[in-house]
Curated annotation (Swiss-Prot):
Pfam families linked to this entry: NAD_kinase, NAD_kinase_C
HAMAP family from the UniProt entry: NAD_kinase
Designated name of the protein: NAD kinase 2
Protein family according to the UniProt entry: Belongs to the NAD kinase family.
Organism name: Parasynechococcus marenigrum (strain WH8102)
């Protein structure tokens, strides 16, 4: 029988306990289980005094994970899902996300659905939804100094107690544009409901083949979010004398210096989500973000 992976946020006792239960049930059904910690996908932040992450993004793949696996079950919150995406996308392993955290916007199932989810897994009745993924690379000349995959977004912004920044941004073959702001966000459709949404960007349906550029606290009224084809690679040149902070999906990043440039392109390795039922994106927006709910009736003026 095909092997099944388990990716667990081992910092959460509930996730570990649930993983033990799932592993026992899968092994009783005859499946070999390969277990890994989600910490392997949390690249972390590279400090100036540390060596930057010179390895490619495939270095996050756990030992024993490859494209012969049927799927990997992910236990944790949305942060765990973002880490698991880095661990599985390079080898094409689909992920079934079971939430043991808070909001669970990226979760396919909750603990109350566990029995039904395992039944679907054992009978192989799931479907696959692919989500676009980014490769984020920091370059200095011809040298790659840092690289990671990103399911949500890359945010490049100033440090505290520093001035407003300028960014020269080239999209594809087009001439660079200058943006004056506290920072910029480059996001996928999946990431449009995350940091980019808080910065004033639009919500984008995940089946749209686009990327989104959103300024953070822009200086100009003309600086607004831009949506464009994801076939276009993006290069961000820091046009400011101070170092900047780059954060990818909230759990990875490094400092970017004036002599560096950030390259962002769509990855050839999408994140493959296991769907137990038909996935209706607008219903997810309604249930988890309150989109489109009726306004609360105003109180009567007595």
């Amino acid at each position: 029988m095909p092997r099944i992976g388990l990716i667990v946020n081992d910092g959460k006792p509930l996730a570990v306990q649930t993983a033990d239960t799932i592993q026992q049930r899968l092994e009783l059904a005859g499946h070999a289980v390969v277990r890994a910690s989600s910490s392997g996908g949390m690249v972390g932040f590279a400090n100036p005094d540390q060596h930057l992450r010179l390895l490619g993004y495939s270095a996050c793949v756990p030992e024993g994970f490859n494209n012969s696996m049927a799927l990997a079950i992910v236990l944790g919150g949305d942060g765990t899902v973002l880490s698991a995406a880095r661990q599985t996308a390079p080898v094409g392993v689909p992920i079934l996300t079971i939430n043991t955290g808070h909001l669970g916007f990226l979760a396919e199932a909750y603990l109350g659905d566990l029995d039904r989810a395992l039944e679907v897994v054992l009978t192989e009745q799931w479907t696959i939804e692919e989500r676009s993924n980014l490769v984020v690379s920091v370059m200095r000349g011809d040298q790659r100094r840092w690289e990671a995959l990103s399911l949500n977004e890359m945010a490049l912004h100033r440090e505290p107690l520093t001035s407003m920044c300028h960014f020269e941004i080239a999209i594809g073959r087009h001439a660079p544009v200058d943006i004056a702001a506290d920072g910029v966000i480059l996001s996928t459709p999946t990431g449009s409901t995350a940091y980019a949404l808080s910065a004033g960007g639009p919500v984008i349906s995940p089946d749209c083949p686009v990327l989104q550029l959103t300024p953070i606290a822009p200086h100009s009224l003309a600086s607004r979010a831009l949506v464009f084809s994801d076939r276009e690679p993006v290069t961000v040149f820091p046009a400011t004398p101070e170092r900047l902070m780059m954060v990818v999906d909230g759990s990875a990043g490094c400092y970017v210096w004036p002599e560096d440039r950030v390259l962002i392109r769509r990855s050839e390795h999408p994140v493959r989500f296991v769907r137990l039922v038909d996935h209706e994106f607008f219903q997810v927006l309604r249930n988890k973000l309150g989109w489109g709910l009726p306004h609360i009736a105003k109180p009567d003026k007595g």
